């Protein structure tokens, strides 16, 4: 079915503003995730053992560095190279497909983190849950390798779904008054099918994430009821760990839903309506979500907080030394 599409031009001011916001989001996202990566990788360099959660955070930060890089490349494509009055170029197709795969890996890693929190914090007398928690703690490395394998399988299937369909273009110009014309790219439908397939592939990890997060919420409720009965002191390490874990998981859920909605909305904006401003807004929202969750992860992780404190103290002492040096030089003069 052919669709009448109105191609709207984007002013230089809008493109410049979007590019500035994209650079800012890329800088914040790159710095926060690179910080998580470097803190944990430094322990690997020093041959210190990494905990299971640190291993997952290390992999999660790598996947998000790729996400931010791809979204920044998408922003550059939108502002400088891709004209929506023309068919989507191959490089923009490749960026979108790579983003879908990186986003898939990001979801699997967040699910792995949720299962790990669940296995560590849930207190249960059921034998099955105890065995499952022990299995998750012991098999975390195998789970990470499985995530890499799933991402590779998703890559192959998305590429097959994209290239297995016939590629041809139908472009019919009806009239050119007010830059209105009939423009339909059958080739872009293949991108939509790949996008839909990739998100259907995301249903199993998302359900696992919801189940493990729900179990953690139930466990927190039971723990708080137990504390109300037996003690009045709410400064319990287990309670604080529950709350920090839930804060991380709930924030990821919110950011993932917002990012997924923006991604779904961007598809018809890009393929059907050719609305570049709408696509820019969606890309900006998608780039902000991983940065927000990375900041929450840093605030909820003791090792990362200590690293932030150390860096701030070092920066403060360096500024103080420079100020004292300038004051001494002025006194001598």
Swiss-Prot record:
Q: Residues on the Cytoplasmic side? A: 39-55, 116-142, 212-251, 298-333
Identify its membrane topology class: Multi-pass membrane protein
Q: Which InterPro entries match?
A: TAS2R, TAS2R38
Task: Give the Pfam families listed for this entry.
Answer: TAS2R
What residues bear carbohydrate chains? Answer: 178
Residue ranges annotated as transmembrane are 18-38, 56-76, 95-115, 143-163, 191-211, 252-272, 277-297
Q: What keyword terms does UniProt attach to this protein?
A: G-protein coupled receptor, Glycoprotein, Membrane, Receptor, Sensory transduction, Taste, Transducer, Transmembrane, Transmembrane helix
Give me the Gene Ontology terms describing cellular component. Answer: plasma membrane
- Extracellular-side stretches of the chain, per the record, are 1-17, 77-94, 164-190, 273-276
GO terms assigned for molecular function: bitter taste receptor activity; G protein-coupled receptor activity
Whether Metal-binding counts among this entry's keywords is no
Top-rank taxon of the source lineage equals Eukaryota
Query: Where does this polypeptide localize?
Result: Membrane
Q: Which family does it belong to?
A: Belongs to the G-protein coupled receptor T2R family.
Q: What does this protein do?
A: Receptor that may play a role in the perception of bitterness and is gustducin-linked. May play a role in sensing the chemical composition of the gastrointestinal content. The activity of this receptor may stimulate alpha gustducin, mediate PLC-beta-2 activation and lead to the gating of TRPM5.
An additional note in the Swiss-Prot or TrEMBL entry is: Most taste cells may be activated by a limited number of bitter compounds; individual taste cells can discriminate among bitter stimuli.
Q: What is this protein called?
A: Taste receptor type 2 member 38
What is the originating organism of this protein?
Hylobates klossii (Kloss's gibbon)
